[in-house]
């Protein structure tokens, strides 16, 4: 009977040790993932900033990702250049307005 208790205690100890290592590995993976996401957030282009060289790098807004919106600018020399900035498209603004209005009504 005593040998059985010792074996069971040993098995419980081994299982808890191996599961704690697995949890530590999961926590480390989760931490690395969060750090990568934070790095991505730092590298994204904020609203109203220029995105001419990186048209897919705009940050996320409250509900949607900002879109790179481009316009043609004519310089004083008469040259046409394309300038882009991160902004909220009109249909996204309308959706945000409706959601905000709905939140005020329904709380």
Curated annotation (Swiss-Prot):
Annotated signal sequence range: 1-20
InterPro entries: Spider_toxin_CSTX_knottin, Spider_toxin_CSTX_Knottin_CS
Annotated compartments: Secreted
Any one Pfam family match given in the protein's UniProt record, by short name: Toxin_35
GO molecular function: toxin activity
GO cellular component, one term: extracellular region
Similarity comment: family membership: Belongs to the neurotoxin 19 (CSTX) family. 04 (U1-Lctx) subfamily.
Record comment regarding domains: The presence of a 'disulfide through disulfide knot' structurally defines this protein as a knottin.
Protein name, as recorded: U1-lycotoxin-Ls1b
Source taxonomy: Eukaryota, Metazoa, Ecdysozoa, Arthropoda, Chelicerata
